[in-house]
A protein has these predicted regions:
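Expand to "…catalyze enediolate/carbanion chemistry for C-C bond making/breaking, isomerization
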Residues: 1-157
Length: 157
């Protein structure tokens, strides 16, 4: 299996350079499958507080119009109130939406209650994952604390 390559579009500069990015992918026959629009970083680069902002939606629609043969996935602070944003983009060709840990293929027929359920499940999974990592790394940190004390005592003797 060939790895799937994605390109993050997460800044005002990336949006500005999208034509040259897409041309390079095409000219060099790069195995890029998808563009991933990161609304959080994109909105920060534009100094826009709300990722649901109309300007962010317009930028996303513009990127979808230029996508060529690539899929486009959207992420960045997805929550239940993101449904109208995702729904509007689904009608323009959005392939998928994602949280940091879960990706969902979209469709024009996606219903609000299904979307809310998917987002809640994804966020619950991510929260469980983070708590698991925190517990695991906390235990590792305790082991390292013991090793640090052992080495420090060796250096003193």
């Amino acid at each position: 299996n060939t790895p799937k390559l994605f390109i993050n579009i997460e800044s005002q500069l990336a949006v500005k350079n999208i034509d040259s990015i897409l041309k390079l992918i095409e000219d060099e026959n790069l195995p890029v499958e998808s563009l991933v629009i990161g609304r959080s970083d994109l909105s920060k680069s534009l100094k826009i507080v709300d990722v649901e902002n109309k300007k962010i939606l317009e930028i996303c629609i513009g990127l979808l119009k230029k996508k060529r043969n690539l899929n486009v996935t959207l992420g960045g602070n997805l929550m239940n109130k993101s449904f109208p944003f995702i729904s509007a983009l689904s009608k323009k060709g959005l392939y998928a939406f994602e949280s940091r840990k879960c990706t969902f293929k979209t469709s024009e027929s996606l219903k609000k209650h299904n979307f809310n359920s998917l987002i809640s499940t994804a966020l619950e999974f991510e929260l469980s994952w983070l708590n698991c990592k925190k517990n695991l790394y906390g235990e590792r940190s305790k082991e390292e604390d013991l090793r640090i004390k052992t080495i420090e005592s060796r250096l003193k003797s």
